[in-house]
Every structure is written in C-alpha cells, then in structure tokens.
Amino acid sequence: MGLFDKIFGNYSKKELAKIEPIKNKVLELESKYADMSDEELGGQTAILRGKLDELSTLDDVLPDALAVCREAAFRVLGKKPYPVQIIGAIVLHQGRIAEMKTGEGKTLVACLAAYANSLTGKGVHVVTVNDYLAKFQSEEMGKVFHFLNTSIGVVLTGMNKEQKREAYNADITYGTNNEFGFDYLRDNMVIYKKDKVQREHAFAIVDEVDSILIDEARTPLIISGQGDKSTKLYSLADRFAKTLKPVTVVEMDDKADNDLLDGDYIIDEKAKTATLTKSGVKKAEKAFNVINLMDADNMTLAHHINQAIKANGVMKKDIDYVVKDGEVLIVDEFTGRIMQGRRFNDGLHQAIEAKEGVEIARESKTIATITYQNYFRLYGKLSGMTGTALTEEDEFREIYKLDVIEIPTNKPVIRVDHPDVVFKTEKGKFNAVIEQVIECHKKGQPVLVGTVSVEKSEYLSRLLKNKGIKHEVLNAKHHDREAMIVAQAGKYGAVTIATNMAGRGTDIMLGGNAEYKSLADLQKMGYSEEVAVEAAGFSNTQDEEVLAARAEYKKLYAKYSDEVKELAEKVREAGGLYIIGTERHESRRIDNQLRGRSGRQGDPGESTFFLSLEDDLMRIFGGERITAMMDTLKVDENTPIQSKMLTGVIESSQKKIEGRNFNIRKNVLNYDDVMNTQREIIYKQRQQVLDGEDLHENILGMIKEFVEDSVNMYITDEDVQDNWNLQGLKERLMGIITVEDDFNYTPQELDEITKQDIIDLLEDRALKIYAKREEDLGQELLHEIERVVLLKVVDTKWMAHIDDMDELKKGIGLRSYGQKNPVVEYRMEGMDMFDDMVASIREDTVRMLFTIQVRKNSAAPKREDVLKPGEHHNMTVRKAKKPGRNDLCPCGSGKKYKNCCGAGNGVQADEAEQEENSSDSSEE
C-alpha cells in the first residue's frame, strides 16, 4: 500500500463501502423472487417497467431488477451470481469501469447490468472485441433475457440492414466495437430515415474496455470509397528503396544522423520512423531525374519514397502484418489478432504490398471517419469491464470521465508470480524457457507461453519440436482456431504458445473445456461447425438437424464434464496453469493480462517472465544503463541475472512507453475533437432533415444568402460604381437568376442605383422564379427534392472537407517551428475551411434546385417571365461582406484580393507574406 492510500484510504474500498448497502438489499430480496413461479418471475419485467414509469430514476428499482435477473440466471443457466458479481453489476450501472480478474464471470455481470438498464426502453449496447464473443454471449445470456420477456439482438459483420435494425430495436444488443462504430457512420450517410439502423446511444457496457478504449484508440474508424487507381510510383519507389543502405539507431539525433555518410536512410527504432539522409536524397534525385526532391512539385514522389523506406525498413512481416492468400493483413500489436478489413493509411499499405510483391490495391477515399474516443463519448452513460484497468486509470478519467473500481475476487488469488528471470542473450533466454517447459511437462502441469510476435512464436515452436514436445500454436496465422486452442490450454500436460493473450475472451479451465471437446466430437460425427455451435447455444429453434445435434451434445457434455473434473484435480496437484512470458510488452497491462490467465476462481497457478538484455524493450528503452550493465556483467548466456536495478529499469521503461502512447492517443483525440465539433454540426443538421423538418423556409434563406454573397463578391466598394463588376456578377448567376439583358444601365441610371438595390432586385427575382417552380412541380414534390438535394450536397461537400482537413493535418506540424501550437492552428484554419464548406453547400444546393430537371408535363418557369430587367426595390443598405484575403479579387484582375483592391486595408507587408506562407503549407 502506498503512502497516499495509507493516509487517505483506498479509493475502490471507499466506493465499494457505498455500494455495499445496495448489494445487501439485492441479497435480501433473494427469497422473495425464489418463491415465485417461472411465470410470475418472467412477469416481473412488465411490473418493474411500470414502477419505473412512476418513479424518478432507475436507481429506485435497481435492487429488484438485479434480484430478478439473478434468480432467472440461476433457473435458466444454473448459475447464481455471487455477491461480488452483484457489486460489479452495480458499478456498471453507475457508469464506471469494473476491474474484475479473469474467470470472475464478467459475462454474467454484464447480463445483470444490461437487464436493469433495459427497463428504460432506450436500449443497451453490450460491446465485445469480436463477432464470436458477441454471438456466443448473446445466445448464452439470451436465454435469461427471453425468460424475462426482454428482447435481445446481436449485430454481426455481413448482416443486412433489416437484420441490423431488428437487432438495434431490441432491448439489449450485443455486437463488436467495429460494427457499432461503422453503423453509426453509415447511419449518417443515408438519404431516408427508414434506412437508419441504430437508435439513440443511451448506455453501453464495453467488455475488455482497455483493449477497445485504450489500445485501439490510435486507429480511427474509416469508411472508404474507391479512390484513384494505384500508381506505378509504389512499385518504382519500392524498387528504389531496396537499393538503399539503411542505418538503424535507437533514437534519432536529427543533425548528427542526417549527416551520416554511410547510410541512405535512418531507421529510428524508438519512434518507428524512416528518414532519408542527404545521401539518400541525392540518390533519389538521380534515380528519378529531379533537381530538388524537396520541391513542392515533387511532393508526391517524396511521399511515395518515404512510405517505401518505412515499409522496407520499419514494418516487419509476421510482426506488424502477415501475408495470407496474396493479401497483406494487419496484425494487432496488442492482441496478435488479424485486423480484418483494416488497412494502413496514407499509402503505407500499398507500399507494403509493393514490398511483398502482391497486387497493389487502389487507393481509398475517406467518406466518413470517427475515433473510438469520440464514438463512445456519444453514449449518455458508458461503462466497462476488464481484468486490468488500474494502470490506465488516469486516461480513463481524463478522456472518458470514467473511474475504475477494483472488484474483489470471489475466492482469493493463490497464483504465485515469480520474479523476472533475465539473461544476457536471447538464445540463453529461450534455452531457459524450453527447460522450464520440459520440467512442467514431466509432471503434467499445463504451460501457456506468451510471445510478442508471430516470428518468435514460430521460433519457439521449432525449438519445442526439436525436443519432441507436442504443443499448439496460436497466432495471427492460426486465428481461426483461436477459441478451441485457448479452451484446451488448461488440459493435463498441455503446452500452448500464444502471441499476445490480450482480450482473448475465452476462459482457460483446468483439466480442459468440456464444451469445446463436445463441439469437436460433433464435427467428427459429420455436423457442420455452424450446426455444432448452434447445438451448444441457447437459441430457440425448430431445425431438426440442430435439435438432433443438441441431444448428442448434451450426452457428450455430460461425459466430458465428469472427465474434466477428474483431470482438473490432477492439474491442481501438478501446480495449476504455468504462465511463461518471453518478453515484456510495452504496456504493463498486457503483461498483467497474460499472468491473469492463470489462477482463476481460486485455482493454483504460477507465472514467470523470462527476459534478455537483447529484447526490444530493454535495448531500445533501457538506454545507457542497460549497456553499461551488459559490459560489467561477467556471466555466460545461460546464467540468469537478478538485479533490483534491472527490475527498476524494466518498470520505468514500460512507464515511459505508456506515457508516450498516451500522448499519441491524446494527440489523435485533440485533432479529432476539432473534426468532432464539425461532425456533430453536420450530423445534427442531417438528422433534422431526416426527421422530416420542413426545409422550405431554410431553402428560401439559402437563396437570399447566396444572392447576397454573390453581390458582395463583385460589388466590393458600394460607393464607387466604376469598381462594380456587374458583368462578372451576371455571368456568375447566368442560367439561374440573371439573363443576358440584365444590368445594361446607362451611366445616369447607374448613379442612382445602390448596391442594396441590386441585392433586392436579384433576391426578389430569385424568390419569384422559385415560387413558380413550386407552382409547376407541386409543393410536395419540390419539398422532397429540396430534402434529397440538400442531403446529397452536404454528403459530397463533407467528404471533400474530410480530405481537405486530412491534408491540412499532414502539414500543420511544421507550424511548431514557427513557435505556433499546431492543434490551435488546425482548429482555427479548420473552422475557416468549415465556413467555406457551408457557403459552398449553400451555393451548390441553390444551383441544383434551380437547374435540376424533373420530368413533368408542365415546363419549368422562364426567368424572363418572372421579372422584367430593371425592376428595383428600395431597402436599407447593409454593410457589404468582403471576400477572404486569399480569394481572387472580384474586380477581375486575377490577383488575390489582399494584393489588389484589399491592399489598402492597413495590412503590413510582412503579415501578408506570413499569411501567404501559412496558406501554402496547409495546402501541402
């Protein structure tokens, strides 16, 4: 216990003390609901909803709701939630994170909290890390919900809109973070409200909350459309990159390293970047026949070369990605899973495809995007569960306003966590790992070995094969057998090698898993995997094949359950599951997750981390202290090193990396917050249109603003008619409002006309043309056209704006050299660009509404018939809205406004120059 805890007491303990009375109330209600018949218990949902309508908050019915669900779970599943699980459910209901160790029954905890919150009728989303868990948990817990007359849905990849809409309309919806996020983006691209699938974001329970809200927070959700064809530049740049000589450094010193003469590009291991040296730049200029690679005209070429050297120098096959069936697939660095459907952005994925010699895919165009941080902040109430969250508590508080409550285990954890064993070399480390595996294997103790990459897991597998030890390998190449492999990792004598065990979601039970053994036998009997899984599930079905398989499954399960119980006792006697870590992860949390696979529900277990001074974490982040220690240690590679200083270096290195990664995630969020403000405005406006809000008055307002903006562009100085560019104004509005004979004023007539007269003339004419259009088309049809046109224009402009903002972000970092905050600059310029986009939406909407052709018998109105040229209307003159300083001058000179008619506005030359440069760098 730290000094802070000694003085002030542990935060979790204080909060648990407040929750204790609610838990006790739930336990007191046990006998009340146990005495009810099934029908009476199932009818409690309607009664509780009725009470909720009368009472002010859900808290008033919470104890009854949890007690009802607890009794239902016992009757349906044979599992009665423990008191600690009730506490976990209360924590989730309160919108917090419940830290619960592996094997403590988080699925049942989510079931309790989801049921209680479903009583509001607003919907509950239970978020899992993959489709398998979403389907399995929804089926298992679905039986409880069906018993309680509560509807349940599951959202899976590949479902159509009707299936998804039905799932979202259920009281409780299970699904993955990807599907929930992508469906939100897709919903904000529809033209008709009936095409939306989601409803409001009321309450979410996020399973493996640290994996979803922390680890994946650096990767935004992006819906892409097909962009331009992939250019030959990727292949040419790759061929060139392969001729260059790389130099690897732990951390780059810009000046010293760029002057290196013996390397063409530098690989910075700590920052994971690749940078051309002077030598590399010269070779590029010669190879591609350009004078200056850094010239603005060569930016595309420079970008392709930079991505090619990163693909070849930084990105490692079987660590960062795998190649499967001619396709480059990203490997999640935290879980070791393949990230299906994800691609590296900014052309890096194409560069890797060129490197690996597979087909280079088309470049993509971003249609919609959001970060996980901003998606999950949409929920009115957010909660989560994980085995390890305390190390990231500060981030949960700062970003999501969530606190972390440690839930005590149902039984004490008796796992023995041994001190780290450190070796001088990697070879010595793996020799020791093999010896430890052999020692455990001899006595039948199951072993789970965690590795940090596919490459290391396969190397270890070869060593075990050489020793004749039968084992299973779980990594990104074998992810399709993931659940089966993990489920049997606790068998007597089992040896399992797994890449990054984070978020695996399947409990490792000592003695093996009766369910998975039964499933395997069903498939051997000829049942398909789909039928076997459904047979083991809880869904209601009339399918005869599934019912027959379910009968077989029950027999097999009963048989294997007895076997597993006997074997589990043998495994306990052998010491339980032994966890071996072969390298420290960048995050302490991932290490803790690996350890947490052992010692569930009071079972025995052990864990040891075997490390070497050659491990990436030690080598890259350990710094000079590790190097000095290596020089002074006079030990061979097979002798373990134990040192308090070494342990301290490891922990401080991990804290350093965690801090750096937090800053990266925070930086991503800072930029996305700018986009998020704009996204909320656009999506809110879209929703109002979808909800059927009458747009007609808004459209009339747009017409007036469009006219006024147009006049302001061409009549900048209202007092000097000689400067009026009436010809330019006429041409701008030709085909919409103006006709050829307009503005043919004599000098005398011109002297009597004000700028406001022009505005009034054009506004009046435009409104009359539009009124005639409404008369011809009919009010109902025109209003529907208005709705569709506005949505289409908004979507088109918003997509282009996303690209523009992305381009702005790429170059904005350079502003820091001018002592400017890049995020502040991004926000300011981003808002200017947003204002420009809104004006552009207005203009394009008006133009389309005036020119769109609708096949009707009646002809569209002619502008000449609506208003005769020369008619004026006198109104109060308003101050002209001037064009932007970087806009082309309306006088027609071809110069920028600030360097022409706007030059006399008191702007200093150096300020103008500075703004010119800013504009250019943002375009880059």
Residue ranges and their predicted role:
Residues 33, 321-329, 335-343, 572, ...:
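Extended, charged helical/alpha-beta scaffold domains that provide interaction surfaces
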Residues 449, 497, 798, 834, ...:
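Hydrophobic, well-ordered secondary-structure elements that form the walls
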Residues 1-612, 616-634, 684, 705:
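Conserved P-loop NTPase motor core
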Residues 3, 392, 493-494, 678, ...:
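Generic detector of short, well-ordered, non-transmembrane alpha-helical segments enriched
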Residues 1-2, 178, 274, 865-873, ...:
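Compositionally biased, intrinsically disordered low-complexity regions used as flexible
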Residues 444-457, 692, 718-720, 746-751, ...:
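Short, Lys/Glu-rich amphipathic helical modules
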Residues 879-898, 902:
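Short Cys/His-rich zinc-binding micro-motifs
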